[in-house]
Amino acid sequence: TAGSAANIRLLSKNYIEMGIAQADLINDAYNGTGIFVSTQCSGYKAIAALYPEACQIVVHNDSGINSIDDLLGKKVSIGESNSGTEQTANLILQLNGLSDKLVDTLNYDYTTAAGKLQSGEIDAFFCTAGLRTTIIEELAQQCPIKFLSISDSCSKKLESAYDTYVDYTIPANTYTGQTEEIKTVAVQAVLLASNELSDIVVESLTEFLFEHSADLQYSVPVNLQLDETSAVYGNSNPY
């Protein structure tokens, strides 16, 4: 799908039985705020927060872009329409005083955005995803890239407006050529289930997730964090 918002809408209309979405968008959908102000969604519950999704802002290494402020007047992909990445990107740009009139924002999926950054058709792209994001690592192996950090003032404003966001550090050497750690923010990716699923199915799935989290880690490219504390962190909606 196009991402978090699409998954939430599909769940609420019973087109799908399960989906993953960013915690901030789940809260907006449940409360009828943000992009869901006129289309409050219901009909689903959270199973567990699975892993943190880090906001990664990627630019070419020799672009001369060294901070979010430098994105003024630049072509920037903010993720697909109705995606969690789009919401996060818009919030961060706005908190840095960069409205869509000051930045040429474009809606590309990650693969397209990476290709256009490499070819010089765009100047930067946002990617909100679990580490180590495959498309970014593949890009890093093909051309020199770097990441923009999010300032303390921006992260504090974001976390004040949305308690689903937390400070996050991308460790050095997470990606090829990335020798310094990156200060950013992260939001939990939460597994949702339709209310139409039986309690037995949901309970069995939840039990399987927690009992086999170590085994599941080998089959996914993200750092699963499944324990009783992290599973409910950053999401205030019903489980």
Model-assigned labels for residue ranges:
Residues A2, E80, F126, N195-E196:
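Conserved residues at beta->alpha junctions
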Residues T174-Y239:
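Segments of small-molecule ligand-sensing domains
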